[in-house]
Amino acid sequence: MSERLLEVSGLACRRGPALLFESIDFTIEAGTALCVRGANGSGKTTLLRTVCGLTRPDAGEVRWRGAARGEAFRGELLYGGHAPAVKDELSAEENLHAALGLAGAEVPRDRMHAALTDVGLFTRRALPARRLSQGQRRRIALARLILDPAPFWVLDEPLTALDDAAQALLLRTLDAHLARGGAALLATHHDLPLANDRVRQLRLGA
């Protein structure tokens, strides 16, 4: 039986007076992903941010490896928001290096260059991010996924602004992450062609 990594029980959140969701319960085991679906405004991003500890819930509890979230949880988390966390004044390579450094991941330069090659940014690695398209900025985040060893990925609309080739690479990267025992929580409008025994669905606003 796979290790239970994340447990969410009785979660509820409001936006002002409006109730976004309530009584949300789920678990995520090693080697599996949960895809959160729902219309715009249903609370998908709020749910992800609440799980990560970035938004305080109105009710409920989130536990990691059977305990309250703390430094250990933050050290094992990779959060990718709806907009890529890219600094305009830094190059693609510098942004990647900075993101990995903040995560405490020591990655040799040759591996960073290989990841930038995989995502089609190697020849643009020295360009300031402000000169990159939205899709290219998303590819920096994809390169981080390839390199970051964090076991738990929380990704908000990870396929947005990626072309077909980059989407396919992201899905292969996610599949490999799950195959080696990682876990993921995703908010997405897309059907993810991953093994059915690895992916479950949660619909908000149904």
Spans of features found by a protein language model:
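Conserved ABC transporter NBD signature motif
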Residues: 57-75
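Catalytic Walker B motif of ABC-type/P-loop ATPase nucleotide-binding domains
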Residues: 153-157
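Q-loop/switch helix immediately C-terminal to the Walker
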Residues: 83, 88-104, 111
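Helix-to-loop junction immediately C-terminal to a conserved catalytic motif
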Residues: 52
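Conserved ABC ATPase signature
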Residues: 89, 128-135
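Hydrophobic anchor residue at the start of the ABC signature
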Residues: 142, 181
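Conserved ABC ATPase "signature" region
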Residues: 97, 109-124
